């Protein structure tokens, strides 16, 4: 009989010292600093690290249906053998469908009335999935089947941590 594997249940802690974040004169940053530094972290579990060393493929599709998935063997294999989130929906945001992609890639809610992807190109985005994977030694690529500059993805996606390819730039 094999021994039960040991599951690391230590806290998930981001090595960030909130005391070093300059907040003087900025009430919003002060409030955020106080909030995040007081939070109790969640604990790791049996799923933590289960994909270490594996490839990760995230597909975001503006409209996608299971009805024709069997006609595309590679997508069919990914859907039937991987994680398939069938009840994930993004709300209708005011600007464009790219806001759903923005939410999926950044983990944040887009700002109303503006092109969040374009605006994010000027911000530090260290916590995106691509940036986190790069820290672990992975490469992160993003592809789109429209023109390279569509929705200013040529500015936003490299800033999110991706090597970006689209029509006119590698696709």
Could you say what each language-model-derived stretch is?
Residues 2-171:
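Soluble catalytic regions of membrane-associated enzymes that act on cell-envelope
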